[in-house]
From Swiss-Prot:
Family recorded in the similarity comment: Belongs to the glycosyl hydrolase 18 family. Chitinase class II subfamily.
Signal sequence interval, chain numbering: 1-16
GO MF entries: chitin binding; endochitinase activity
Official protein name in the record: Probable endochitinase
Active site feature: 304 (proton donor)
Primary site of residence: host cell
InterPro entries with a match to the protein in the record: Chitinase_II/V-like_cat (IPR011583), Chitinase_insertion_sf (IPR029070), ChitinaseA_N (IPR013540), Glyco_hydro18_cat (IPR001223), Glyco_hydro_18_chit_AS (IPR001579), Glycoside_hydrolase_SF (IPR017853), Glycosyl_Hydrlase_18 (IPR050314), Ig-like_fold (IPR013783)
Enzyme class: hydrolase
Motif Prevents secretion from ER location, chain numbering: 547-550
């Protein structure tokens, strides 16, 4: 009897399924683009890899080890081999969070381990959880799907403004423009930047060891290293604005995010790109930038301005710059089309341009539009505290009621561009989420405050002469509010101080909204989103009725 029982037990063991595998502990966080959290130079900041190797080993503490082993990612087989090896290596080339199991098999059955999580990060954000927007201030849901509604988000907004990506009402936007991506270059190539204390020096730190005319990140801490909501874990490879944008895009798959290259103080290098070699370096670096930072959907060129009259008065050659602008856009478009074939992703090429008639005249925009998906018409900054005698509307649709000959208007710019042959649907009209103004305004006649002269710039929110819409709205009781029905322009005036501020109000933005629909334009965009309390973006998204719909 004992011999019989022993035989039965032996047969049961001999024909039992393999023992349950237990996966050994390991750090299973990987990154296809690795970021050096201590680096300040872009050359040392990132390393792009085609794939990562994920090793796995296991033990069986009770029972047989099996004949064959399989490694499963999310229940899909990714490796097969001899079970006796008790180890495997899996090559991974896409991002995600994977439940990994080991499955052991023999002729009598199989056993499966408990899952462990393998996290492979990439800059498409596939490893992250969606970052949802929590509705705040006056923002309310609603976005038209037949037009562009865009806004600029600035890299430095995470500091004094306290405005990270999670505060941006992204469900209400079709496009977010990230300001700004710089172009490397030192003395003589980025002199305009020296007007901002510490900014030129910061760029030199970021561009250390990197060739002139390559793009970089101006502030790596703000962009990719600063812990923020949703990307604050110690082992999260992509923190900062970029990390949040990756996660926010998962929650808003409709959103297009474009890096805006240039801007007021970062446009100097463009003036040197008539040199084909310098231009080639730039275009290739933009391609590399998009390959590294996969959450971006193209590129925005913000050259202020071809022909000059920008931040650096020493630069500008109208005829040469006009040619440079066209060939630069052509080469960027060709590069993006080539990249699109490699990635199967659609890339947009856009450009922010001046709405001043004198600057529009420099460029053949009928030719430029062939390469552009959108033209962001900066229909603001017409007037400001750089002059204490030439007071006027800093943003307006039409000429003021008191100056019918004014040519610095949105309507005049649109007519000039469409007159050149630019397709109306490519034109995106600008909204100013800030005001420009003066203090000590006096000598005006009656209530014609712009007929006076000023003592200087009005005290500003972040710089004198410039006041955020949020602040204007919060302090509205201190002012007389007026809306020029002829110009479709808003302003406020404080008689005691002589503070006069021209700005976009809900009234003027609704007027721009109607204008866009009446003229078949592409939509609206705003500078800059952190200055709004939701009022202006709501007005940009408002479904307005025009006369032919009544």
């Amino acid at each position: 009897m004992l011999h019989y029982l022993a035989t039965i037990l032996w047969l049961a063991v001999a024909h039992a399924s393999p023992g349950t595998p237990v996966i050994d502990w390991a750090d299973r966080n990987y990154a296809l683009v690795s970021v050096n959290s201590e680096a300040t130079a872009y050359e040392n900041l990132v390393e792009r890899k085609a794939g990562v190797s994920v090793p796995v080993s296991w033990n069986v503490w009770n029972g047989g080890v099996g004949d064959m082993a399989y490694v499963l990612f999310n229940e899909n087989q990714v490796w097969k081999g001899a079970a006796a090896a008790k180890r495997a290596t899996i090559d991974v080339s896409k991002s995600g969070q994977f439940n990994m199991r080991v499955k052991l098999c023999d002729d009598d059955g199989f056993s499966v381990s408990e899952p462990v999580t393998v996290r492979v990060a990439d800059t498409d954000g596939g490893h992250l959880s969606p970052l949802e927007y929590a509705w705040g201030e006056n923002n309310k849901p609603g976005r038209p799907h037949n037009k562009t509604v865009a806004a600029y988000f600035v890299e430095w907004g995470v500091y004094g403004r306290g405005f990270p990506v999670d505060k941006v009402p992204l469900p209400n936007l079709s496009h977010l423009l990230y300001g700004f991506i710089p172009i490397c270059g030192g003395d003589g190539l980025n002199d305009a930047l020296k007007t901002i204390p510490g900014s030129f020096e910061a760029l030199q730190r970021s561009c250390k060891g990197r060739a002139d005319f390559k793009v970089a990140i101006h502030d790596p801490w703000a962009a990719i290293q600063k812990p923020q909501k949703g990307v604050s874990a110690w082992n999260e490879p992509y923190k900062g604005n970029f990390g949040q944008l990756m996660a926010a895009k998962l929650a808003n798959p409709h959103l297009k995010i474009l890096p805006s290259i240039g801007g007021w103080t970062l446009s100097d290098p463009f003036y040197f790109m008539h040199d084909a070699d310098k231009r080639r370096v730039f275009v290739e670096s933009v391609k590399e930038f998009l390959q590294v930072w996969k959450f971006f959907d193209g590129v925005d060129i913000d050259w202020e301005f071809p022909g000059g009259k920008g931040a650096n008065p020493a630069l500008g050659n109208g005829e040469r710059d006009a040619d440079t602008y066209l060939v630069l856009l052509k080469e960027l478009r060709a590069m993006l089309d080539e990249l699109q074939l490699q990635t199967n992703k659609t890339y947009e090429l856009t450009s922010a341009i001046s709405s001043g008639y004198d600057k529009i005249a420099v460029v053949k925009y009928d030719a430029a539009q062939r390469f552009l998906d959108k033209i962001f018409l900066m229909s603001y900054d017409f007037k400001g505290a750089w002059s204490n005698t030439d007071l006027g509307y800093q943003t307006t649709l039409y000429a003021p009621s008191w100056n019918a000959n004014e040519l610095y208007t949105t309507d005049h710019a649109v007519k000039l561009l469409t007159g050149q042959g630019v397709a109306a649907h490519k034109l995106i009209v600008g909204v100013a989420m800030y005001g420009r103004g003066w203090t000590g305004v006096s000598g005006y006649a009656g209530d014609k405050y712009f007929s006076g002269t000023a003592d200087g710039p009005v005290p500003g929110t972040w710089e004198n002469g410039v006041v955020d819409y949020r602040q204007i709205n919060n302090e509205l009781s201190k002012y007389i509010y007026r809306f020029d029905a002829a110009a479709k322009a808003a302003y406020v005036f404080n008689k005691e101080r002589g503070d006069l501020i021209s700005f976009d109000s809900v009234d003027s933005v609704l007027a721009k909204n109607v204008y866009v629909q009446q003229n078949g334009l592409g939509g609206l965009f705003a500078w800059e989103i952190d200055a709004d309390n939701g009022d202006l973006l709501n007005a940009m998204n408002e479904r307005v009725r025009v006369k032919d719909e009544l």
